[in-house]
A protein has these predicted regions:
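Structural signal for well-ordered, non-membrane alpha-helices
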Residues: 20, 94-98, 151
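GST-like domain detector, emphasizing the conserved glutathione-binding G-site
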Residues: 1-57, 107, 127, 179
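Short N-terminal edge-element motif at the start of the domain
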Residues: 73-107
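GST superfamily/GST-like fold recognition
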Residues: 107-127
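A non-catalytic, amphipathic alpha-helix used as a structural packing/dimerization or gating element
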Residues: 7, 11-15, 85-92, 96, ...
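Active-site/pore-lining binding-face segments in mid-to-C-terminal subdomains
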Residues: 120-179
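Divalent-metal (Mg2+/Mn2+/Ca2+)-assisted nucleotide/phosphate chemistry catalytic cores
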Residues: 33-87
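Intrinsically disordered or highly flexible coil/loop and linker segments, enriched in small
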Residues: 25-28, 103-107, 132, 156-160
Length: 179
């Protein structure tokens, strides 16, 4: 998961850090910003924590989870003022990653990297909620394939050079992280 090439290894580490520090904002904001996503997510959490609960108990627990989590979106910097920026950042990232992943199975080539795992963890969860699931499944087949591939990642080739990654990965890095 650690490329030998120092530049590509740095990019992997940069993507890992980005996934932990910014992409979690996408997931958390989107999960708790809209009723449809709140209900779906809270329902999954309730079902996972109480698999033997009755329908009535699950409804009650779902609402408890929902109320608790919606009130926490501010912890990741999500509020009415920042919501448009968080969502615009996510939508641009999804488009950029779709383009980048059209020609390779993983972010840095033929095998998963440290960066894949971090970013995937957030985007997998973005995909499990109805609003963004509909977007990804309708318009982003390469990104969807990567999300699903990362459930059981395997080596399919080597890491690519920075020169081969740069045309489609640098725009993502520039827009999301900076120059």
């Amino acid at each position: 998961i650690y490329p030998e090439d120092t530049t590509v290894n740095f990019v992997s580490t940069l993507l890992e850090e980005f996934g932990d520090e910014w992409a979690n904002k996408w997931m958390f904001h989107c999960r708790w910003a809209r009723d449809i996503d709140q209900i779906a997510s809270a329902g999954r959490i309730a079902q996972l924590t109480q698999p033997d609960a009755s329908s009535e108990q699950l409804e009650e627990l779902t609402e408890q989870v929902r109320q608790r989590m919606v009130g926490r979106v501010g912890f990741v910097g999500s509020n009415p003022e920042t919501a448009p920026q968080i969502e615009a950042s996510l939508h641009l990232a999804l488009k950029q990653l779709e383009i980048h992943l059209e020609s390779r199975p993983y972010l840095l080539g033929g095998r998963p990297s440290f960066g894949d795992f971090s970013l995937w963890g957030q985007l997998y969860n973005v995909w499990t909620d109805p609003t963004n699931c509909a977007l990804i499944e309708a318009k982003m087949p390469s990104l969807l394939a990567w999300i699903q591939r990362m459930l059981w990642p395997r080596i399919e080739g080597d890491f690519e050079s920075w020169e081969s990654l740069k045309p489609t990965l640098k725009p993502f890095i520039k827009a999301q992280i900076g120059e």
